[in-house]
């Protein structure tokens, strides 16, 4: 990276740090720890619309301000695997009428492991002729990529040419964790910064003991590494594919103290308070757990008031936020009972407005 690029990167990072610090200042937060990103080739996911122009066909994106389309032949934010695939894929699709007909979008999902899933989205139904062409495409791409899979999507249709997931291997504090990342399910896009987030969370919980509750646990991104520090971990997640991936990940990482339940945060709150029983909690007696710590990684809207009141029951709260504005709103209530002991900024998306943040809250007194 040139000195000019480094300067540009640092300037946008400094602006984010100032913005987060201002939002956290009413809560007497300590100085924010900052975890930078590679300025390019950091994204493990990318999606593009496809534009047809005569015999040509290319990826496009839309300018966020003008809404004008522009051609994208390479995409510096995406990892090198995705960039390599973009050119090679279109070179194969352009002359192939079966693969290009009514193709309107291409999604890429990759991993530090080098695995790749390419999803081709169509405005037409896909038949056996398409599947044969897609298998041939996969064989051709396999000469360049060690493990590549193709998915065809159309209305109410999904054809998978071998797998709809990548197997990721994340290095975290000297351990390697295996994760199945499923196409069209949420995963952290910036794998290297994600590792830093997990390591920060591990540092937060190092002195703690007892059991951990994680809400919005996804495929176990935090639950699994943190299981090494707690007696037991219970994770809640509403998305069925993520729950299934989490079960696979628990087995792959040989963890015996983690349970994932398919409940919304609001439902789990009701179960904890004994207001409702759920068949999905069969075999799990919540009263037997000694939950000392809760980790939440909510969507952009933050936590609802009932969930906030529920997590106030725990001595330690690790809050991962993809929206610092709603984090600050939630802290107004949480700060009645807890102090901000640590704060961190993770630059998941360089050169964008987006901030990923983390705070550790500990009970007052």
From Swiss-Prot:
Belongs to the class I-like SAM-binding methyltransferase superfamily. RNA M5U methyltransferase family. TrmA subfamily. Dual-specificity methyltransferase that catalyzes the formation of 5-methyluridine at position 54 (m5U54) in all tRNAs, and that of position 341 (m5U341) in tmRNA (transfer-mRNA). It comes from Alteromonas mediterranea (strain DSM 17117 / CIP 110805 / LMG 28347 / Deep ecotype). The active site is at residues 322, 356. GO terms for cellular component: cytosol. This is tRNA/tmRNA (uracil-C(5))-methyltransferase. S-adenosyl-L-methionine binds at residues 188, 216, 221, 237, 297. Pfam families: tRNA_U5-meth_tr. It is an enzyme of class 2 (transferase). One of its GO terms (molecular function) is rRNA binding.
């Amino acid at each position: 990276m040139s000195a000019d690029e480094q300067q540009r990167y640092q300037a946008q990072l400094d602006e984010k740090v100032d913005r987060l610090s201002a939002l956290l200042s009413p809560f007497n937060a300590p100085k924010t720890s900052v975890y930078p990103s590679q300025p390019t080739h950091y994204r493990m996911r990318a999606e593009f619309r496809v534009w047809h122009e005569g015999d040509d066909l290319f990826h496009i994106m839309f300018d966020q301000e003008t809404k004008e389309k522009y051609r994208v032949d390479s995409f510096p934010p995406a990892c090198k695997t995705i960039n390599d695939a973009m050119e090679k894929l279109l070179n194969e699709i352009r002359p192939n009428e079966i693969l290009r007909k009514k193709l309107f979008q291409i999604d890429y999902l990759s991993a530090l492991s080098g695995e790749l899933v390419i999803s081709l989205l169509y405005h037409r139904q896909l038949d056996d002729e398409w599947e044969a062409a897609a298998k041939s495409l996969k064989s051709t791409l396999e000469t360049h990529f060690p493990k590549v899979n193709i998915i065809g999507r159309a209305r109410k249709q999904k054809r998978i040419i071998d797998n709809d997931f990548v197997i990721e291997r994340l290095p975290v504090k000297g351990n390697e964790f295996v994760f199945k990342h499923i196409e069209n399910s949420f995963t952290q896009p910036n794998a290297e910064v994600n590792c830093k987030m997990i390591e920060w969370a591990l540092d937060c919980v190092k002195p703690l003991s007892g059991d951990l509750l994680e809400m919005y646990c996804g495929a176990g991104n935090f639950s699994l590494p943190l299981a090494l520090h707690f007696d037991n971990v219970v994770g809640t997640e509403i998305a069925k594919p993520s729950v299934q991936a989490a079960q696979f990940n628990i087995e792959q990482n040989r963890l015996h103290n983690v349970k994932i339940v398919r409940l919304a945060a609001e439902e789990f709150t009701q179960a904890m308070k004994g207001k409702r029983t759920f068949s999905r909690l069969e075999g799990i007696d919540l009263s037997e757990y000694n939950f000392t710590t809760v980790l939440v990684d909510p969507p952009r809207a933050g936590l609802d008031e009932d969930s906030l009141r529920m997590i106030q029951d725990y001595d330690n709260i690790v809050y991962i936020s993809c929206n610092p504005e709603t984090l600050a709103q939630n802290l107004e209530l949480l700060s009645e009972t807890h102090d901000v002991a640590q704060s961190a900024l993770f630059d998941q998306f360089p050169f964008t407005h987006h901030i990923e943040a983390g705070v550790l809250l500990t009970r007052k007194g």
